[in-house]
Swiss-Prot record:
Keywords: ANK repeat, Cytoplasm, Mitochondrion, Phosphoprotein, Repeat, TPR repeat, Ubl conjugation pathway. TPR repeats lie at residues 283-317, 375-408. This is Protein fem-1 homolog A-A. ANK repeats lie at residues 2-31, 40-70, 82-111, 115-145, 149-178, 182-211, 214-243, 519-561, 565-594. Disruption phenotype: No visible phenotype in normal conditions: mice are fertile and develop normally without any apparent malformation. In mice model of chronic inflammation, mice develop more severe colitis induced by dextran sodium sulfate (DSS). Mice display less microglial accumulation; decreased microglial activation is observed in the brain after systemic lipopolysaccharide administration. Mice also show behavioral abnormalities, possibly caused by monoamine deficits. Mice display reduced anxiety-like behavior and brain inflammation in a model of Alzheimer disease. The lineage of its organism: Eukaryota, Metazoa, Chordata, Craniata, Vertebrata.
Length: 654
């Protein structure tokens, strides 16, 4: 173990005597090095603050000159926080004594992490009320600094259910109607977490029932997450709001602080008069809650109970609230339509499958196709069908969800990428199942695979049309890899000549986009790289793949294309020791003696321990023109401007 690691470990374990021994007599420069970041990204001071070792913290700052602002990486709840200062780590862990010590020694109370999280937010996250009071009350920590998502300290306190912290922040003037980057408010966070008491507290401070970026009210948010207590309160109860300062916190005065005037019991309005819920909103909330009971809670009887109440409200007082007529019935939903009468609703008791379709229909109508939950639960229902062996229903539902995602989400959305990967894994399983069972297995048709492959190419086209190209994006590389896996599977399915032509047209569309993955890899580079195999949890295709390479070459892939290190696909095939693929590339016109950025040919990259070299004879493919080009390059003969441009490009190839 080196000295730097030993110092870090001593600080981590709170072993002050050992730390003093290790650092005693060191010069300033050596101390700076030893107190810097270790390989994991943290500093000795940062980890000591994280672990609450007050004596170690004060020794490192007072005697060793450690900076109280030096940030690094620290781990909390399985997550790595980048750019965290020591005060943030101590606040997140609830070490009040360390927090006091660091602030006395000059730490900035509002210094943020890389994601713009403050020490106050860190304390709010895990419910450290004493730290929150100290940061705000003694050091005037800014309540309104939001993280990179626009999420404030009040919002995270509400989401985590820390009632007393939320109460304290409101008393200190936290903005109750502040909106995040996605448009949600603290009320949304209460609704999503089921914190009814905090929700009542916020309403007492005149919180407004706003819609977020998806058009969701807190009422709908509670329905989506299945918090019946919130839904019931918002649509039915009419209590006075909870007093903000019914029992004043020590050292605090009136409930009107920094502009927040929250209700006392005498002046509180009934809920229905200050934030009335319309009959239509209540109906939709109950219908959506029922859908949540079907898919999330798997409680069909509970769902029926909520749907009955919604139906009663629709018919209440003789003024029927009609459901909008669907523009067309959906094959994926088995052409189901929503029930509109109490009799139709009661008939669902005998048909659980129809109930599940009702849940999907209701969710799509109320949330709309752009809400993530809409496509998520369609995919979930498809997965349940697949688990029971009903692959056809699964494929229909997943295709419908994929169309919905591509029409409503941004290109390369993680949800869309997940859909493509799920398709690839399902198709791989079905083909293996068919191979094992023969005629008893499901017939996976060309149209199923081809349809998804075409949508995958469309996703790449959409991504490349964005103002900012995806470049070396890991998500973009994964999208290309999944397309190659789908092509790999498609090669296992028999095709008619017209289907073969359609397949080649689609691959040509992909190549025409000229997409580039990691390190500038073209699809042909990726097809000859073993890393392309690792695309998900389950194996789909195996790469390098000769079949995929041949299809790409047949459709016009350039065998001499270069990545960022000037490697051709031939170089990558050589690194992966694939002589058969190398032969195919050479037959397609790849230059055997083309060199990369390190002046290596593909032949020189072959593993000498394997027999691959004996099957590839470079001199069978090297021309006199190639030898002349290499001689010019090797001897540094000036040629630019003296020969035609085509010849210049040829020499540069070598």
């Amino acid at each position: 173990m080196d000295l730097h690691t030993a110092v870090y470990n001593a600080a981590h374990d709170g072993k002050l005597p050992l730390l003093q021994k290790l650092l005693a007599g060191r010069g300033r420069e050596e101390l700076e090095e030893l107190l810097g970041e270790v390989a994991g990204g943290g500093t000795p001071l940062l980890i000591a603050a994280r672990r609450g070792h007050l004596d170690v913290v004060e020794y490192l700052v007072d005697h060793c000159g450690a900076s109280v602002e030096a940030s690094g990486s620290v781990h909390f709840d399985g997550e790595t926080i980048e750019g965290a200062p020591p005060l943030w780590a101590a606040s997140a862990a609830g070490h009040l004594a360390v927090v006091r010590s660091l602030l006395r020694r000059g730490a900035s109370v509002n210094r943020t992490t890389r994601t713009n999280s403050t020490p106050l937010r860190a304390a709010c996250f895990d419910g450290h009320l004493d730290v929150v009071r100290y940061l705000v009350g003694e050091h005037k920590a800014d309540l309104e600094v939001a993280n990179r998502h626009g999420h404030t300290c009040l919002m995270i306190s509400c989401y985590k259910g820390h009632r007393e912290i939320a109460r304290y922040l409101l008393e200190r003037g936290a903005q109750v109607n502040r909106r995040s980057a996605k448009g949600n408010t603290a009320l949304h966070d209460c609704a999503e977490s089921g914190s009814l008491e905090i929700l009542q507290l916020l309403l007492g401070c005149h919180a407004r029932m706003e819609r977020d970026g998806y058009g969701m009210t807190p009422l709908l948010a509670a329905s989506v997450t299945g918090h019946t207590n919130i839904v019931e309160y918002l649509i039915q109860e009419q209590p006075g709001h909870e007093q903000l300062s019914g029992t004043e916190l020590p050292g605090e005065g009136s409930s009107q602080v920094a502009g927040n005037h929250c209700s006392t019991p005498e002046e509180a309005e009934p809920y229905e008069s200050c934030c009335p819920t319309s009959r239509e909103a209540a109906v939709e909330a109950l219908e959506l809650l029922g859908a949540t009971y079907v898919d999330k809670k798997r409680d069909l009887l509970g769902a029926l109970k909520h749907w009955r109440r919604a139906m009663e409200l629709r018919h209440q007082g003789g003024g029927y609230l009609p459901k909008p007529e669907p523009q067309q019935l959906v094959l994926a939903y088995d052409y189901s339509r929503e029930v509109t009468t109490p009799q139709e609703l009661e008939a669902l008791i005998t048909d659980p499958d129809e109930m599940r379709m009702q849940a999907l229909l209701i969710r799509e109508r109320i949330l709309g196709p752009s809400h993530p939950d809409t496509s998520y639960y369609i995919r979930y229902r498809g997965a349940v069908y697949a688990d029971s062996g009903n692959f056809e229903r699964c494929i229909r539902l997943w295709k419908y969800a994929l169309d919905m995602q591509q029409n409503n989400l941004e290109p390369l959305s993680p949800m869309t990428a997940s859909s493509f990967l799920s398709f690839a894994e399902l198709f791989s399983y079905v083909l293996q199942d068919r191979s094992a069972k023969g005629n008893l297995g499901m017939q996976l048709g060309f149209a199923d695979l081809m349809g998804v492959l075409s949508k995958g190419v469309r996703e790449v086209e959409r991504a490349l049309q964005l103002p900012k190209e995806p470049g070396d994006s890991a998500q973009f590389t994964k999208a290309i890899a999944i397309i190659l896996h789908l092509l790999y599977l498609l090669e296992k399915v028999e095709c008619t000549p017209s289907q073969e032509h359609l397949k080649h047209q689609t691959v040509y569309r992909l190549l025409k986009c000229a997409p580039r993955g990691k390190n500038g890899f073209t699809p042909l580079h990726m097809a000859v790289d073993k890393e392309t195999t690792n695309v998900g949890r389950y194996r789909v295709g195996v790469f390098p793949s000769l079949q995929v390479v041949k299809v790409l070459l047949d459709c016009g892939a350039d065998p001499d294309s270069r990545d960022f290190d000037n490697n051709t696909p031939l170089h990558i095939a050589a690194q992966n020791n694939c002589p058969a693929i190398m032969d195919a590339l050479i037959e397609a016109g790849a230059h055997m003696d083309a060199t990369n950025a390190f002046k290596k040919t593909a032949y020189e990259l072959l593993d000498s321990k394997l027999l691959a070299k004996s099957t590839v004879q470079p001199f069978n493919y090297v021309t006199l023109q190639c030898l002349a080009a290499r001689a010019l390059d090797r001897n540094k003969v000036p040629y630019k401007g003296f020969i035609p441009e085509e010849l210049e490009a040829f020499i540069q190839l070598h």
